[in-house]
């Protein structure tokens, strides 16, 4: 019994030693010492000011902060480190001579959050240069020689919050990076000061939210003087935005090769800036934004009657959306007034006042009024044209009259206006004279110079003897005579 018990104990001892050796072999890994000319403190590796031409090899995998500033590095290749530094969150490469960075240089450091490339010799930011840094929050590129910035250089950098590009030679920056909220959604600071910018998309800049404009630095650029530029910066000054308030003296523009401060009203002769109110018509749908200088703030709206808008206003048309904006379903006249937005954050509070003017008519009804007035005006013009056509273009009946025969040499003529109830008949045309009504009534008018008014003779004048005419022939009226309607002597023929 005793030998078997000893044998069993021996086997247990050997098994324990084997398991111990296996665990040691599995957990064992090469220990990397601190590189030469570097200072290691826990997970911080400092190799600054060592005149290094290349990055030290065999960097410890636990490194969280790597300082390579103030050296002689000129190129950052894809294989600059053979070790994948997944714990590295800060990389300092400032004050070197870097003029080339590979598009795959940041693949070994996918969790980098802070990258300092300032004070180098970079000229171009190529396409997808920083696209592998999806966790990067701060990028320093100031004091380089950057001229060209590709619009896709900062692709897939959803966590980027601060981008420093001052003291370069940039003449055009792709501002669509900040206009499109999906490109760099968390960007709160963009420093483009001390560059070569001459023109700005002023209309697009006005539409940016206040928290973007608050961190958009544009001072010390040779901007072209313009009243719209003054209006833009005056609005930022009115809102107390840091990008203007901190550098008012450095905001200048160029006119006739001379520098002028943007706020020089005497020189610009620009109208003074006044904050405009929101305008709406009856029945309009309107959304008023609480344009705060910081993101993620809690917003509370107060109506002109000093009532807090919780979910729905007193008249049932005003609500507050999830993003803190004031929404009007159908604007009413009583909705007009000054609304106040109280924004509260962890370290900053802000109060905004917005005036709403409501016009007491619908926009559609206003167009109907204009259409009615236009139709009335057109109708009046057409009426005047028709009257003018009737007066000046109506055919004259005298055009259709035949040429009258001249009167006889005695001047005897029968000037009459025939008034008859039946058509004229020739009495000698045959048939019985009693078969039809052939009685004519005429008012004779004096034809000669010896007659006075109403057929009476003037003193000293004689009535001329008329010349006999053929049987059945009518006398021609004298064209020089007056119409017989003024005669008072009826004659039955």
Curated annotation (Swiss-Prot):
Repeat region (LRR), residues: 62-83, 87-108, 111-132, 135-156, 159-179, 186-206
Disordered: annotated segments: 405-493
GO BP term, pick one: cellular response to L-glutamate
Sequence ranges on the Extracellular membrane side: 28-372
GO MF annotation, one: potassium channel regulator activity
Disulfide bonding pattern of the chain: 34-40, 38-47, 225-253, 227-270, 290-341
Every Ig-like C2-type domain range: 269-353
Induction notes from the record: By HMGB1/amphoterin; in cultured hippocampal neurons.
GO CC term, one of those recorded: voltage-gated potassium channel complex
LRRNT domain ranges (all copies): 28-61
Bias (Basic and acidic residues): 431-442
Comp. bias regions, Polar residues: 408-424
Positions carrying Phosphoserine: 477, 481
Signal sequence range: 1-27
Subcellular location as annotated: Cell membrane; Perikaryon; Cell projection, Dendrite; Cell projection, Axon
Membrane topology (UniProt): Single-pass type I membrane protein
Domain LRRCT: residue ranges: 221-272
Domain notes: The LRR repeat region mediates homodimerization.
Record's subunit section: Homodimer, and heterodimer with AMIGO2 and AMIGO3. Interacts with KCNB1.
Reported function: Promotes growth and fasciculation of neurites from cultured hippocampal neurons. May be involved in fasciculation as well as myelination of developing neural axons. May have a role in regeneration as well as neural plasticity in the adult nervous system. May mediate homophilic as well as heterophilic cell-cell interaction and contribute to signal transduction through its intracellular domain. Assembled with KCNB1 modulates the gating characteristics of the delayed rectifier voltage-dependent potassium channel KCNB1.
Name of the protein this chain belongs to: Amphoterin-induced protein 1
Organism: Rattus norvegicus (Rat)
Organism lineage string: Eukaryota, Metazoa, Chordata, Craniata, Vertebrata
């Amino acid at each position: 019994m005793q030998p078997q018990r000893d044998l069993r104990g021996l086997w247990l001892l050997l098994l324990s030693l084997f398991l111990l050796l296996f665990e040691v072999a599995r957990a064992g890994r090469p220990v990397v010492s601190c590189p030469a000319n570097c200072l290691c403190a826990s997970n911080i590796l400092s190799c600054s000011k060592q005149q290094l031409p290349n990055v030290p090899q065999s960097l410890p995998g636990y490194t969280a902060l790597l300082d390579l500033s103030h050296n002689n590095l000129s190129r950052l290749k894809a294989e600059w480190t053979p070790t994948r530094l997944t714990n590295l969150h800060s990389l300092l490469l400032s004050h070197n001579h870097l003029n080339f960075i590979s598009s795959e240089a940041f693949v070994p450091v996918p969790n980098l959050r802070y990258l300092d490339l300032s004070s180098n010799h970079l000229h171009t930011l190529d396409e997808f240069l920083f696209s592998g840094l999806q966790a990067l929050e701060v990028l320093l590129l100031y004091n380089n020689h950057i001229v060209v910035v590709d619009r896709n250089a900062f692709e897939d950098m959803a966590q980027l919050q601060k981008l420093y590009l001052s003291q370069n030679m940039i003449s055009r920056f792709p501002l669509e990076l900040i206009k499109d909220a999906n490109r760099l959604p968390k960007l709160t600071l963009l420093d483009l000061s001390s560059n070569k910018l001459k023109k700005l998309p002023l209309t697009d800049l006005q539409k940016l939210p206040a928290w973007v404009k608050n961190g958009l630095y544009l001072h010390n650029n040779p901007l072209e003087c313009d009243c719209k530029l003054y209006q833009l910066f005056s609005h930022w000054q009115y809102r107390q935005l840091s990008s203007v308030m901190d550098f008012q003296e450095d905001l200048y523009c160029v006119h006739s090769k001379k520098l002028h401060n943007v706020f020089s009203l005497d020189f610009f002769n620009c109208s003074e800036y006044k904050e405009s109110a929101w305008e709406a018509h009856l029945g309009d749908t309107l959304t008023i934004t609480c344009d705060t200088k910081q993101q993620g703030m809690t917003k509370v709206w107060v109506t002109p009657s000093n009532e807090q808008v919780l979910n729905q206003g007193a008249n049932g048309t005003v609500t507050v959306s999830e993003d803190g904006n004031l929404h009007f379903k159908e604007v009413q006249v009583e909705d007009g007034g000054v609304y106040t937005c109280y924004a509260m954050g962890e370290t900053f509070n802000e109060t905004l006042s917005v005036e709403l003017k409501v016009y007491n008519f619908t926009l559609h009804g206003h167009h109907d009024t204009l259409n009615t007035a236009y139709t009335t005006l057109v109708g009046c013009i057409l009426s005047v044209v028709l009257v003018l056509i009737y007066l000046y273009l109506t055919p004259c009946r005298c055009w259709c009259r035949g040429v009258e025969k001249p009167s006889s040499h005695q001047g005897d003529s029968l000037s009459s206006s025939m008034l008859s109830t039946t058509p004229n008949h020739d009495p000698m045309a045959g048939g019985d004279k009693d078969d039809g009504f052939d009685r004519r009534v005429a008012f004779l008018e004096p034809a000669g110079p010896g007659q006075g008014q109403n057929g009476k003779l003037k003193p000293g004048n004689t009535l001329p003897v008329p010349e006999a005419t053929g049987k059945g022939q009518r006398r021609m009226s004298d064209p020089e005579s007056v119409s017989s309607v003024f005669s008072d002597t009826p004659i039955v023929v």
